[in-house]
Regions:
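Blade-terminus and WD-like Trp-Asp/Gly-His loop motifs, strongest in beta-propeller folds
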Residues: 3-20, 26-30, 72-78, 117-138
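Beta-strand C-termini and the immediately following turn/loop, strongest in propeller blades
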Residues: 25-29, 38-40, 84-87
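Short linear interaction motifs
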Residues: 60-76
Length: 138
């Protein structure tokens, strides 16, 4: 598990899967925190981002000055990962199934022809998270 202690407004945590080419990135550049599903085999950084999810808007946090802990936990096969903030799951990426979801269910896009990643919904899925966590500790 890769972790970072940070104060909202400036954070960067990148975590590589043991199963290349997958990478998960948590980033907060000021107004908001995002979680990215990335494919390192792509030629440009722009093309490497498979999906992006809003984790929080800084102004909506109860105490934006409070120090927090971000952690990225990978599944044993390296095909899935979860972003935890202060121990609470906030986002899930399944690289094999090409889907992601988060607590904010944002952003959602109209699915376009040729899209290989599900982007029309980021709705939270408790069952998938429970399965992920059960497999970790089995």
């Amino acid at each position: 598990m890769d972790s970072l202690t940070f104060t909202p407004g400036r954070a960067f945590l990148s975590s590589n899967s043991l199963a290349p080419p997958w990478t998960a990135v948590f980033e907060d550049e000021g107004p908001a925190g995002y979680f990215y599903a990335c494919d390192r085999s792509q030629e440009t950084q722009e093309h490497s981002i498979m999906d992006a999810m809003l984790i929080y808007n800084r102004t909506s946090l109860a105490d934006p000055a409070q120090e927090r802990l971000a952690s990225i936990q990978w599944s044993r096969d390296g095909q899935q990962c979860v972003l935890y903030l202060d121990g609470s799951a906030q986002a899930f990426i399944d690289f094999a199934a090409h889907l992601s979801f988060c607590r904010t269910n944002f952003p959602n896009y109209i699915q376009e022809q040729g899209d290989t990643w599900r982007k029309h919904s980021h709705a939270w899925d408790d069952a998938a998270l429970q399965h992920f966590e059960a497999d970790l500790y089995a």
